[in-house]
Amino acid sequence: MKRDGTWGDSLESPSNMTATLLTYASLYALGEAPEQTKKYLTDKFGGYSDSHIINGVLNYYGTDRTFSAPILMMCALAGVISDWEKTPQLPFELSVLPQRFFRFLQLPVVSYAIPALIAVGILRFRKGKRNLFSPLRESFIPKSLKVLIRLQPNDGGFLEAAPLTAFVALCLTGAGLGDHSVTEKAMAFLKATVRKDGSWPIDTDLSNWVTTLCVKALGDDLSDKQRMTQIIRRNASAVRHPYTGAQPGGWGWSCSFTSTKKGGA
């Protein structure tokens, strides 16, 4: 923690709202919320009440709920936010539709965050007030969970990313699904990828992205251009991407997504 009660994405990174709020929520759940951070939140949002935090986060991220909804769910689970009704809902039911329809639905999250759409949506639904349509929405939960099972890689890590995987595990646990296979595999991934100092990398596999950046940086000084070209071409996806629906031939952050492996790019 920096002197002003804030955090960055890493020890060397400048402070930012997202890292600060998530860390604050974690400490709040343990009864160790720093007073300095409350001052930061007051300066940033005008206060640290439910409305201040919810409106502040939603205004910061705009209409895209890819990050704002999971962040607010964590705050609610930790007790930073007490009124679930004020938090945004996500239409987890839409996940059961054929992927080709997603482009027409104006989903509140980006396509690679469908796991978050499902987990956050189920949690928010189960924590909210019941109404006439609640039984219908409840009936979609098993179907949505089947989609989540299909999207989860063998190692349990969604997109090889600790944040997305942790959000899914947190939300499913909060929704009473802590013993579900998706939750258990997600927890296993987090336990397997934690560093010795207790931290996690933002992503466990950025090999393809880092390789291409290095190639660009080296330019004409690259010693074996032909071999590197072959490696990059080989890392192109060979099948349709299960999250985004992208056609074969594209690249992701990692080289773990191939025609023979189940996982994210």
Regions found by a protein language model. Give the residues of each.
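Preference for long, amphipathic alpha-helical scaffolds in soluble/luminal domains
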Residues: 1-265
